[in-house]
């Protein structure tokens, strides 16, 4: 089942109208006339990861290769929303894997990051989901993921710390078990 079945957009629009009304806005004023429709459309876009599957985003782009050395895609920008406040967190992901006979099409790594980032999420889970997806698709000897992000829920509200960055990492297989492999990855993303 798709996350936004037909007709659900209308209820999203109605909910945004109600939110605007509840915060004291005049929903009939000129600047807000189309806001509920635009906000519903934006929310569908920002949460489009619910509409995607791993099979769809990788699209069988797995290729035979004798390479067993590290493959790293660095600085993949990501935009997500925290599940606690529904505020954005923005950053980048570094994803590496050690192939075992198969390599994944380059753009597919970024598409995996996007699919999971475009869901209500916490960064810790996002990092793990990316790593496990790459592992599942490639059957790699190891996968490493580091995500660095700035969280609007910490910058705009609460403690209001604008210069903090959260860093999470997940190491699977050889990256977890072999300190030299892990160190090589970490040195490459500096």
Curated annotation (Swiss-Prot):
Question: What cellular-component terms does GO give this entry?
Answer: cytoplasm
Top enzyme class of this protein?
hydrolase
**Which family does the entry's similarity section mention?**
Belongs to the GTP cyclohydrolase I family.
The GO terms describing molecular function are: GTP binding; GTP cyclohydrolase I activity; zinc ion binding
Q: Which GO terms describe its biological process?
A: one-carbon metabolic process; tetrahydrobiopterin biosynthetic process; tetrahydrofolate biosynthetic process
Answer whether the UniProt record assigns the keyword Hydrolase to this protein. yes
* EC number of this enzyme: 3.5.4.16
Write down what this protein is called. GTP cyclohydrolase 1 1
Q: Which UniProt keywords apply?
A: GTP-binding, Hydrolase, Nucleotide-binding, One-carbon metabolism
Q: Which Gene3D superfamilies match?
A: 1.10.286.10, 3.30.1130.10
The gene name on file is folE1
Write one Pfam family the protein is assigned to. Answer: GTP_cyclohydroI
- Catalyzed chemical reaction(s): GTP + H2O = 7,8-dihydroneopterin 3'-triphosphate + formate + H(+)
Question: What InterPro entries does UniProt report for this protein, alphabetically?
Answer: GTP-CH-I_C/QueF, GTP-CH-I_N, GTP_CycHdrlase_I, GTP_CycHdrlase_I_CS, GTP_CycHdrlase_I_dom
Q: Which SUPFAM superfamilies match?
A: Tetrahydrobiopterin biosynthesis enzymes-like (SSF55620)
Q: Which HAMAP family match?
A: FolE
The subunit structure is: Homomer.
Q: List the PANTHER family hit by this protein, alphabetically.
A: GTP CYCLOHYDROLASE 1 (PTHR11109:SF7), GTP CYCLOHYDROLASE I (PTHR11109)
Q: Which organism is it from?
A: Pseudomonas putida (strain ATCC 47054 / DSM 6125 / CFBP 8728 / NCIMB 11950 / KT2440)
Give, as in the UniProt entry, the pathway in which the protein acts: Cofactor biosynthesis; 7,8-dihydroneopterin triphosphate biosynthesis; 7,8-dihydroneopterin triphosphate from GTP: step 1/1
